[in-house]
């Protein structure tokens, strides 16, 4: 609430001195020589997101494309990337620890983080390979666990389509528990999900040291609805509830245990060591592919991340050991042409294990130039080794070793083998303070991602060996941060070039000869015209294009815009503190037009949505919230693409309302 000039001044100060963890330790945002955005707990609670897409509207340059249920695809200074290893372009973490192990990502893995009860979510746009290593290619999204402190409250929420959610928070000086459960009946026919998340924490500190232990558990049981097909069918309300794949489902569980040790070494610096273990298990029906095979994937890991911050230097060592498995089994005969029926038979398609080892070291060095300028240079060297073991006959055969007609089965199992990748990332940045309220920064950075295990060992057609190498990206960025008595500004201009882009070509081979270019501007502006009104704008202008003609298409596509890459997107929030009890917010979200195919022949026109939120604090001793989403009842698509000769859409939901009440304990 902003009911007084003192509170107003405090908010200005808080926004201009946000504390972040871009370098693994807390520091003022004014010390960061690059872009970073932080969504704080207050914003997260006000948004009350039912899907991570709703919350990330508050970050310029980020689009989390909403699928069905809790599914999503990610874009951070990039198109929405699809394919077996597309998720490897982003480092998604909780408390700095990657949600999934190197080589074992999943495009939907953000639902394995407790974003609904986070103290903050931080986003770094562009490569951040020195600190985070492989997968920090297009960006980093880090979910921070809530602060351990005395607190107690329970929240109940009710909404459209039989939506029910309950949250419980209880904590003391050393312990804290955050848990929530959700049941969503689903807008689409025969869809919906049940989801539970739990975060348990223990924090103990002494004069110079601290120990912080966190346990995360997530469980998702989802009845998944598929794309609806047909040009502009998302505009037909008679079809938007239809579900062509009522048989589809996804079950996913995850556990992560971390222990962070911090030692304040005084004049010698600070030592940080975090040990962790992770376990993930997922089963889902591939309803989007011919044959609809069942995929089962799981992996478990142990590892540590460490850094020593001393004087002008930061030195770190990270290591991870992971064991992963993947199996694909088709229960029924494929429906379709004689070719599909013959080449995609029922039975086991893949069954393999991968033992992975990652070790990396990095160094950051800071040099103060004069009184107002800071130069930072850094480098990271990372080694990734995969030992792959195949448990089925090698090649394009059925599980019993017999060959398929038409030259062999679609799937191709490579022989057991080992692969290793050595990558180096660098950064050089400059931060200059013009005044206490205005600073400029510039940086030249690089990033990489090792191939995902599915890109190497889940082969198709006549490809028996995948000789792909790591993707790499180079970025140049210039930015400005400033604030005044009634405004805040954070904007950056960037240009990136990506080489060795990995994709599946028209012959169904995994290859790595793609080249793409990415450029744009991201801006965030906050304006406080008086003590009761706040206006916040997050906006991105971007252009993503193919820089060569990879075999994604039979056409020349160099210079074409990459599909699912809107040229503009963003959001505007107008918040009004009506009185000490009541607040209101009107939100406009914009998604510009984008092409649905590499040939740029099919286009989605984009859409604009309005959302309304009302809050009552302390009314009858409780806190109340009302959200009305898609106030104008716009007909739109959350995602549009063109595949198998058809337009396909994940349909946006019509106007809907959610009511919540929070009761203190």
Predicted region positions:
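Extracytoplasmic beta-strand/coil segments of soluble accessory domains associated
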Residues: 21, 53-97
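Short acidic/polar hinge/loop motifs at secondary-structure boundaries
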Residues: 97-125, 143-144
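Transmembrane beta-barrel wall of Gram-negative outer-membrane proteins
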Residues: 158-183, 188-225, 246-271, 369, ...
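Structural signature of Gram-negative outer-membrane beta-barrels, strongest in the C-terminal barrel
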Residues: 312-320, 352-496, 528-530, 540-543, ...
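C-terminal beta-signal and adjacent terminal beta-strands/loops
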Residues: 590-597, 615-665
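Gram-negative outer-membrane beta-barrel transporters
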Residues: 314, 368-375, 383, 488-498, ...
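Membrane-embedded beta-barrel scaffold of Gram-negative outer-membrane proteins
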Residues: 167-171, 271-286, 433, 439-445, ...
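Short strand-turn segments of transmembrane beta-barrel domains in outer membranes
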Residues: 89, 128, 140-170, 178-179, ...
């Amino acid at each position: 609430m902003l009911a007084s000039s003192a509170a107003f001044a405090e908010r200005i100060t808080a926004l201009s001195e946000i504390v972040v963890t871009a370098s693994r330790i807390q520091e003022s945002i004014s010390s960061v020589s690059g872009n970073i955005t932080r969504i704080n707990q207050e914003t997260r609670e006000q948004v009350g997101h039912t899907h991570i897409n709703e919350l990330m509207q508050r970050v310029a340059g980020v689009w989390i494309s909403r699928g069905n249920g809790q599914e999503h695809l990610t874009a951070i200074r990039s198109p929405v990337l699809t394919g077996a290893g597309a998720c490897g372009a982003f480092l998604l973490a909780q408390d700095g620890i990657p949600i999934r192990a190197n080589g074992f990502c999943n495009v939907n893995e953000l639902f394995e983080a407790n974003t609904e009860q986070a103290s903050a979510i931080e986003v770094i746009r562009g490569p951040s390979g020195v600190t985070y290593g492989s997968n920090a290619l297009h960006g980093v999204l880090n979910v921070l666990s809530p602060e351990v402190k005395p607190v107690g409250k329970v929240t109940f929420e009710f909404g459209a389509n039989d939506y029910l959610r309950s949250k419980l928070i209880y904590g003391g000086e050393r312990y804290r528990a955050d848990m929530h459960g959700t049941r969503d009946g689903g807008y689409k026919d025969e869809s919906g999900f049940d989801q539970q998340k739990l975060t348990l924490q223990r924090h103990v500190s002494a004069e110079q040291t601290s120990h912080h232990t966190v346990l995360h558990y997530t469980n998702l049981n989802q009845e998944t609805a598929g794309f609806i097909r047909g040009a502009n069918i998302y505009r037909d309300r008679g079809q938007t509830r239809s579900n062509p794949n009522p048989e589809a489902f996804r079950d996913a569980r995850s556990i992560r245990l971390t222990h962070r040790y911090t030692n304040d070494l005084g004049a010698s610096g600070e030592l940080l060591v975090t040990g962790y273990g992770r376990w993930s298990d997922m089963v889902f029906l591939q309803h989007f592919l011919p044959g609809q095979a069942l995929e089962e994937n799981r992996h478990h890991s142990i590892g540590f991340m460490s850094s020593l911050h001393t004087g002008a230097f930061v030195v770190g060592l990270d290591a991870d050991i992971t064991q992963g498995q993947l199996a694909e089994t088709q229960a029924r005969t494929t429906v379709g042409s004689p070719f599909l029926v013959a080449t995609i038979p029922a039975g086991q398609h893949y069954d393999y294990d991968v033992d992975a080892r990652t070790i990396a070291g990095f160094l950051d060095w800071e040099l103060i130039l004069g009184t107002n300028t800071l130069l930072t240079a850094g480098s990271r060297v990372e080694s990734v080794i995969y030992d792959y073991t195949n448990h089925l006959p090698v090649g394009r055969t059925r599980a019993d070793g017999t060959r398929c007609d038409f030259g062999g089965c679609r799937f191709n199992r490579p022989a057991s083998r080992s692969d290793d990748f050595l990558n180096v990332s660098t950064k050089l940045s400059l931060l200059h303070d013009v005044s206490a309220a205005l600073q400029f920064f510039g940086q030249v950075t690089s990033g990489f991602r090792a191939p995902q295990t599915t890109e190497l060992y889940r082969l198709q057609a006549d490809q028996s060996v995948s000789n792909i190498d790591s993707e790499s990206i180079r970025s140049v960025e210039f930015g400005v941060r400033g604030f005044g008595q009634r405004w805040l500004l954070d904007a950056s201009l960037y240009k990136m070039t990506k080489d060795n882009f990995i994709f599946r070509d028209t012959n169904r081979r995994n290859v790595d000869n793609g080249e793409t270019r990415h450029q744009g501007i991201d801006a965030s502006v906050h304006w406080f015209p008086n003590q009761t009104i706040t206006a916040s704008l997050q906006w991105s202008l971007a252009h993503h294009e193919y820089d060569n003609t990879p075999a994604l298409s039979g056409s020349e596509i160099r210079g074409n815009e990459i599909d699912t890459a809107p040229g503009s997107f963003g959001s505007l929030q107008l918040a009004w503190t009506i009185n000490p009890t009541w607040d209101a917010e009107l939100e406009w979200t914009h998604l510009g037009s984008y092409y649905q195919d590499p040939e740029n022949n099919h286009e989605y026109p984009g859409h604009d949505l309005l959302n309304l939120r009302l809050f009552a604090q302390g009314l009858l001793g409780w806190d109340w919230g009302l959200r009305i989403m898609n106030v104008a009842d716009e007909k739109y698509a959350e995602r549009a693409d063109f595949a198998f000769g058809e337009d396909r859409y994940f349909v946006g939901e019509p106007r809907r309302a959610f009511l919540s009440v929070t009761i203190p304990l």
